Amino acid sequence: IIFTTPHNKNMMDTFIVEDYLKFLKMISIYTDFYDFTGYNTITTENINYYESSHYRENVGKLIAARIFNDKSVEVPEDFGVLVTKDNIDEHLENLRKQIKEYDLNKVLE
């Protein structure tokens, strides 16, 4: 099982977005994977992280619940997407939209 780590918003803010999205596209050519990146209810809350790249145990439990479809754990709807070669383009567009909305909200604050 392959998945992307859910980087904290502060780490995501440093990414060269289009390069990162190309990386995700390349992964999808070879295998399906779960993507936990982006700006979502988990990655935008600093409490879920020790610092910008290391998430806390509760986040790990959410990742496992999403991957193994554990209905006993309430996983936020916006956290974790199974990405395939068939849905990668739609997923990348959704990430671009998330990033633009997050950036706009930062400016408006």
Language model region names:
Residues 8, 43-45, 84:
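Alpha-helix initiation/capping motif
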Residues 90-109:
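Charge-patterned, long linear interaction tracts outside catalytic cores
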Residues 29-32, 45-46, 79:
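Generic structural motif recognizing short loop/turn segments at the entrances and edges of beta-strands
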Residues 15-26, 53-54, 61, 65, ...:
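Compositional signal for N-terminal targeting/processing segments
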Residues 20-23, 34-37, 42-43, 48-55, ...:
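C-terminal soluble interaction/assembly domains
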Residues 1-32:
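Conserved, well-ordered alpha-helix/loop/beta-strand core segments that scaffold catalytic motifs
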Residues 26, 66, 94, 98:
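Residues that form generic nucleotide/phosphate-binding pockets
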